[in-house]
Amino acid sequence: NPPFGVEWKQQQRHIENERDSLGYQGRFGAGTPRINDGALLFLQHMIAKMRRAEEGGSRIGIVFNGSPLFTGDAGGGESEIRRWIIENDWLEAVVALPEQLFYNTGISTYIWVLSNHKEPHRKGKVQLIDARNHWVPMEKSLGNKRRRIGDPSDKPKDPDYIGDITGLHGRFEEGASRWVLFDKDGKVVTVTPDAPTGDARGVATAG
């Protein structure tokens, strides 16, 4: 994962030159975020490294704070990058993690899972998994890190929370995940514990 909330001012000229001269043939054709957070630049760089879908495609996972999900006005850099990802149907899942997992911050974090070779039943949908309660306390705190995700392969008495999370993602069961809803700009506008009225599914349509 990239460092949270790191500005990219020192790289600004190089990045904007690539954006303007290469467009979508380069890494940053979808746009650039605000100067004080380069997370979505890092994500675009990773997407550029994905194997082409006709060659088998790729799946990537990246840990972000909440900023790439929620910040940016309609038509702004963050919004346009999200729109590009949603329109290409690359976002497969978002996993909300427990707080206090990292040494130097206690903020909320999320795993983004992206794929350019989605299985047919996942196409046009984004799965949101709420894993905020899948934690066990650290025996000894390390800075802000007071929790970890239970993993019996590491500590045999742990609950298998990693297995639970990966199982939810793999099974893609209706009703087992929450809904994430996007506006026309690809911005998350609401996250609900239940599906919209009249629809019991636990996945959201991205279109």
Features from the language model and the residues they span:
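A conserved structural/catalytic subdomain of Rossmann-like adenosyl-cofactor enzymes
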Residues: 2-207
